[in-house]
Structure formats: C-alpha cells, structure tokens
Amino acid sequence: TIKPFACTKCKRRFCSNKELFSHKRIHTGRPFVCAVCGKYFSDRIILQAHQRLHTGEKPFTCTQCHKSFLYKRNLHQHQQIHQKHKPYVCSTCGKQLKSKLTLNQHMKTHSNIKPFACSECSKSFRFKAHLHRHQESH
C-alpha cells in the first residue's frame, strides 16, 4: 500500500491526509476535553465513546438477546456465546469452548497458579472474582 502522506515529526506515513491529520494530534496533545470529568483525549471519536460512561448510553445491542453494550468490541465478544460452534479446544482435557478468551480462562483451572491473595488471611485464588466472594466472608 502506498502511503504518500508523512508526519514531519516522526516520519510515520499514511494513506490519506485525513489519517495524517488525526495522527498529528498525538504530537500536539489532547485537545478534546470531557465536560463532565475533565479528562482529555486526542480524538473526538474517543471522547464521544468516553462520554457514554457518563450518560449510561449503550448503543450496541445484541440482536439475539437484546443485551446492550458501551463498545462495539464488547458486543462482538458477547455474540460468541450465541454460537453453537466451539472452535477452541483445551489441550489438557479436550473441552470445547466458543472463544479464545474463555479458553484462556478455562486453562487457569488446570494450573496451580493462584495470583489473587486475601490481604486478611493470605488464602489464594485463581480468579479475582473468587477472591472477592471470599473477602465477603470476613
């Protein structure tokens, strides 16, 4: 791909002048500011996505179960639960899973590594959620 538009600061090249213009903001700072919390962003689109945190808007909705999400990537990840096809297979036990994320989480069940320790009694857990559930018992 020919990239005729070059940044004068870092020499990175782009296919269009629009991409170059957007890129240049990383050198000039973050001109877009959230009116609610004051956080700065280098891109207006990123600011708009951030503002949904404050409004509670979740514009990406699953067509199968109608659950809504803040970000499109979370919707795509969620939609994998509706698949019947399970292309990821655990090399230890053969269990079939729908996503690489769930395979990675499943693999922890075969490990002795327990990185989440209770600060009160030092009991350790494989998953952060299990630690939180345990801490409620103190």
From Swiss-Prot:
One of its GO terms (molecular function) is zinc ion binding. Keywords: DNA-binding, Metal-binding, Nucleus, Repeat, Transcription, Transcription regulation, Zinc, Zinc-finger. A zinc finger (C2H2-type) spans 5-27, 32-54, 60-82, 88-110, 116-138. One of its GO terms (cellular component) is nucleoplasm. The keyword Membrane does not apply. Its main location: nucleus. SMART domains: ZnF_C2H2. SUPFAM superfamilies: beta-beta-alpha zinc fingers. Gene3D superfamilies: Classic Zinc Finger. The keyword Acetylation does not apply. One of its GO terms (biological process) is regulation of transcription by RNA polymerase II. Disulfide bonds: none annotated. It comes from the Eukaryota. It is found in: Nucleus. Signal peptide: none annotated. May be involved in transcriptional regulation. Belongs to the krueppel C2H2-type zinc-finger protein family. PANTHER family: ODD-SKIPPED - RELATED, ZINC FINGER PROTEIN 208-LIKE. This is Gastrula zinc finger protein XlCGF44.2. It comes from Xenopus laevis (African clawed frog). The lineage of its organism: Eukaryota, Metazoa, Chordata, Craniata, Vertebrata.
